[in-house]
């Protein structure tokens, strides 16, 4: 760098030289000042274990390319007795054809690494459920290996409703902070509502095909379930590799709810049948990689349905596959053998795989209790 100094050693020259030396010393101090770990880390030092967040890539894989902008299908208004249907069902019918939405937050390196992913925990959450996600990260959703079998975690989110714009902006900032810090958020540009849970399943299947095609198994669950992760891994280890698996709490002979006030309401216009195909309760179920691929193929030819777990049963039926039951998966809680035992007794949960439903503080307490060296259970502690 040049300084405006003459060559003769006048007073001005000396002053100029002193200014220059001071500037160089200050510059050197800044270069040597300690930086935060995030600043010092080079891209080569990032690992799949750490945050792998990113907004959706500019050029995503073909499986993640969104469809054309979603426009209401006016012909849905011709549905029989359309005006008598609840507004939410009317909207579902108008936008039922929209199946591919933009990915707002991606986790492109979630399944990177040579060892592959043995179990991917895919948790359906809502933007405002920050506390639930944090407790899952600290407890059963820890990204670690069980006996050399890597377990990874993802949260599946839509966007908050437009009713309160200021609240929606704050939640968007919250999700962005989480995604950058943890790299475990997938968020799509559709409203996070009960009727759109099916879209989370479909978009997850597309994401798996693009980003994690070699994952051995998948656990799909709500963000208020408790999972005994070691038990899940132990069960999956015993499964033949590369085979069909779709296991949970079987729902056989389940009938559509015709009461319009119920959130599970399904009118005959959407499902004229008297009973759904056999499916597993959506609170939590397990499936294999091959089954996920078969479901994705079947879903292309299966019209969207507002009850997500029943929709999975429809896709299984179309694929020629059947779900199986597992007594360790309890989406409706545990049935106690006697009134003397508390439903929060950790001995009641030590052999289970998944239980619904838990508050965040209960999740932490149960996790600590089950992993306490002082836990002692006798044979009388069983669930039915």
From Swiss-Prot:
It is found in: Golgi apparatus membrane. Present in stomach and colon (at protein level). Restricted in the stomach, colon and small intestine, where core 3 structure is present. Pathway: Protein modification; protein glycosylation. Induction: Down-regulated in gastric and colorectal carcinomas, suggesting that it may be used as a marker for distinguishing between benign adenomas and premalignant lesions (at protein level). Residues 32-384 are lumenal. Signal peptide: none annotated. Residues 1-12 are cytoplasmic. The chain crosses the membrane at residues 13-31. GO terms for biological process: core 3 O-glycan biosynthetic process; glycoprotein biosynthetic process; O-glycan processing; poly-N-acetyllactosamine biosynthetic process; protein O-linked glycosylation. Keywords: Glycoprotein, Glycosyltransferase, Golgi apparatus, Membrane, Signal-anchor, Transferase, Transmembrane, Transmembrane helix. It is a single-pass type II membrane protein. GO terms for molecular function: acetylgalactosaminyl-O-glycosyl-glycoprotein beta-1,3-N-acetylglucosaminyltransferase activity; beta-1,3-galactosyl-O-glycosyl-glycoprotein beta-1,3-N-acetylglucosaminyltransferase activity; galactosyltransferase activity; N-acetyl-beta-D-glucosaminide beta-(1,3)-galactosyltransferase activity; UDP-glycosyltransferase activity. It is an enzyme of class 2 (transferase). The keyword Transmembrane applies. Belongs to the glycosyltransferase 31 family. This is Acetylgalactosaminyl-O-glycosyl-glycoprotein beta-1,3-N-acetylglucosaminyltransferase. It comes from Homo sapiens. The lineage of its organism: Eukaryota, Metazoa, Chordata, Craniata, Vertebrata.
């Amino acid at each position: 760098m040049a300084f405006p100094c003459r060559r003769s050693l006048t007073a001005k020259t000396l002053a100029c030289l002193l200014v220059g030396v001071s500037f160089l010393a200050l510059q050197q101090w800044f270069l040597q000042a300690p930086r935060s770990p995030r600043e010092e880390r080079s891209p080569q030092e990032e690992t799949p274990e750490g945050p792998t967040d990113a907004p959706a890539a500019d050029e995503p894989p073909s499986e993640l390319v969104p469809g054309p902008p979603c426009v209401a299908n006016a012909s849905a208004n011709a549905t029989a007795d359309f005006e008598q249907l609840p507004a939410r069902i009317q909207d579902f019918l108008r936008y039922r054809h929209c199946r591919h939405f933009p990915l707002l937050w991606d986790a492109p390196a979630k399944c990177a690494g040579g060892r592959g992913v043995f179990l991917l925990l895919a948790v359906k959450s809502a933007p405002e459920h920050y506390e639930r996600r944090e407790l899952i990260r600290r407890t059963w959703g820890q990204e670690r290996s069980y006996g050399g079998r890597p377990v990874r975690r993802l949260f599946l989110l839509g966007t908050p409703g437009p009713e309160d714009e200021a609240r929606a902006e704050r939640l968007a900032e919250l999700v962005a902070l989480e995604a950058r810090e943890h790299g475990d958020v997938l968020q799509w540009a559709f409203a996070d509502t009960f009727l759109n849970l099916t879209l989370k399943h479909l978009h997850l299947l597309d994401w798996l095909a693009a980003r994690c095609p070699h994952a051995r198994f998948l656990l799909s669950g709500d963000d208020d379930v408790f999972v005994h992760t070691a038990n899940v891994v132990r069960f999956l280890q015993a499964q033949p590799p590369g085979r069909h698996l779709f296991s949970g709490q079987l729902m056989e002979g389940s009938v559509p709810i015709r009461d319009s006030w119920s959130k599970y309401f399904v009118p005959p216009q959407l499902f004229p049948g008297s009973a759904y195909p056999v499916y597993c309760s959506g609170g939590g179920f397990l499936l294999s990689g091959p089954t996920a691929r078969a479901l994705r193929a079947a879903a292309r030819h299966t019209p969207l349905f507002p009850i997500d777990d029943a929709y999975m049963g429809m896709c299984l039926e179309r694929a020629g596959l059947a779900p199986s039951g597992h007594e360790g998966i309890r989406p409706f809680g545990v049935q106690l053998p006697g009134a003397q035992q508390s439903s929060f007794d950790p001995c009641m949960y030590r052999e289970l795989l998944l239980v619904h439903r838990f508050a965040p503080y209960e999740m932490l307490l149960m996790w600590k209790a089950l992993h306490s060296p002082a836990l002692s259970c006798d044979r009388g502690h069983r669930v039915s």
